[in-house]
Amino acid sequence: MPNIDLPTLEAFVHAIPQNYKGPGGAVAVVRNGEIVLRHAWGFADLAARKAMTPETRMPICSVSKQFTCAVLLDCIGEPEMLDSALAAYLDQFEDGRPAVRDLCNNQSGLRDYWALTVLCGAAPEGIFLPDQAQNLLRRLKTTHFAPGTHYSYCNGNFRILADLIEQHTGRSLADLLAERIFAPAAMKTAELIPDTALFNECTGYEGDTVRGFLPAINRIHWLGDAGICASLDDMIAWEQFIDRTRHDENGLYRRLSSPQTFADGAPAPYGFGLKFEETGGKRLTGHGGALRGWRCQRWHCADERISTIVMFNFEGNASDAALKMMNAALGIPPAKPVRAQANPGWFGSWLNPETGLVLSLEDAGGGRMKARFGTGPEKMDISGENEAQSSMTTLRRDGDMIHLARKDENLHLAMHRLKGKARQDIAGRYRSDELEADLLLVSEGGAIYGAFEGFLGKSDMYPLYAAGPDVWLLPVQRSMDAPSPGEWKLVFHRDAAGRITGVTVGCWLARGVEYKRL
């Protein structure tokens, strides 16, 4: 490819504080192992007036997953070496237990454990300890799809992986990372700090320019799925290590970034803690990270030996910034989608009965819709009277049915339009035997509210909103991890006499949790 258009790239970077508004951040572009651009702005701590620098450490959150998998490959070998240990770990499973490779590739079908903490009554700013993580993970008995058939993001996959690595080696993951990954890669200040409450070198901020920015409170312990703190310079060193070892057939990053497939042979979007994407016909590998008050993203294009890194100490869209930086570095112009007018027949709520997942669509203007299906809203471009798509989802409407496809997830669902009013007779207490947790629903002044109770405590009351007959939505916008699960979908079940017998509770991260009415 021709040389990078440095003025265009610099102009984009210098506009980041205006386009991604927040306290501070740091970004870099690396090509051929050399630093093209390295820039920090703003403040690491607004109150202390401490400036952000390329040496400032920040939590890299889920970007840590690739390093956990790197330790696995470097210290133990192929994932199958730990399959018997996983069987002992998930000894409550009834059938269809995943393999360790499924954990590494986010194909396990396990429900995300941070989402499950909500159902177990956790407070968003509560304390979460290592024994509580094992308590939750070891009680699991089922998956929300057959392992190897689909993709679903699950932090618990990598928490379990960390436990298995430590058990197998007899050493702490922190020591293994320092010795086998950080030292060879010259990541001089990178460190595993599992307790988020202990990190105080830089402050992460909740909020925005409308509500203001407030220091985020985090008191969770995470391991394997996240926990590494690193500076921009540390992350640059990782990209340079990747470039130095690019010709090594057994090089760590070559092994981590190798293509993966689903059980049916279809290409998978994720492997060994790395997300696979494509831009302008070029394959990218990388990962994002999030915690309340923090966002980061790295991308690597092996074909062109280019990497981009974005680190924010606020909840800005680091993934968007990193991809746009990559496109600028690759000389890929912004896409110009062709949009059609929105047909009102799109708008409303749609249910897939098999998964209990709900798709909500509303007009966003300019030939776009706002869709709620996963962890956060998506903007869908309407490309025809009955077709719409985003970067993740394709929709095709046929009257009162929408065919939803998420190719990367190997997921195809028939969504049926919800029509009619919801009955108000849902108040009561419901029990999940698998989680040993309760859902309490009450009616106050004609409005329905719900609360979760379990071994982690009793949650606040959350309002419920009717989506259709026996289908309700319970939004949860703050939780221990970020992003939050979003809208929980509640699908109620009745007997022949019309009495409610139970409810299926789920979201994209944790589907199909069955509760029976007490």
From Swiss-Prot:
Q: Which InterPro entries match?
A: Bact_CellWall_Synth/Modif, Beta-lactam-related, Beta-lactam/transpept-like, D_amino_pept/lipop_sf, DAP, DAP_B_dom
Active-site feature positions: 62, 65
Task: From the UniProt entry, list the residue stretches annotated as the region Disordered.
Answer: 373-392
A Gene Ontology molecular-function term?
Answer: aminopeptidase activity
Segments for region (Important for specificity): 477-487
Question: Record's Gene3D superfamilies?
Answer: 2.40.128.50, DD-peptidase/beta-lactamase superfamily (3.40.710.10)
Q: Which domain of life is it from?
A: Bacteria
Output the Pfam families linked to this UniProt entry.
Beta-lactamase (PF00144), DAP_B (PF07930)
Q: Where are the transmembrane segments?
A: none
The UniProt note on how this protein's activity is regulated states: Inhibited by beta-lactam compounds such as 6-aminopenicillic acid, 7-aminocephalosporanic acid, benzylpenicillin and ampicillin. Inhibited by p-chloromercuribenzoate.
Which residues make up the binding site for substrate?
481
Report any one BP term from Gene Ontology. Answer: proteolysis
Q: What class of enzyme is it?
A: hydrolase
Give the reactions, separated by semicolons, that this protein catalyses: Release of an N-terminal D-amino acid from a peptide, Xaa-|-Yaa-, in which Xaa is preferably D-Ala, D-Ser or D-Thr. D-amino acid amides and methyl esters also are hydrolyzed, as is glycine amide
Q: Which UniProt keywords apply?
A: Aminopeptidase, Hydrolase, Protease
* Record's function text: Hydrolyzes N-terminal residues in D-amino acid-containing peptides.
Family assignment from sequence similarity: Belongs to the peptidase S12 family.
- Summarize subunit and interaction data from the UniProt record for this chain: Homodimer.
* Identification of the protein by name: D-aminopeptidase
Q: Which organism is it from?
A: Brucella melitensis biotype 2 (strain ATCC 23457)
Gene this chain is encoded by: dap
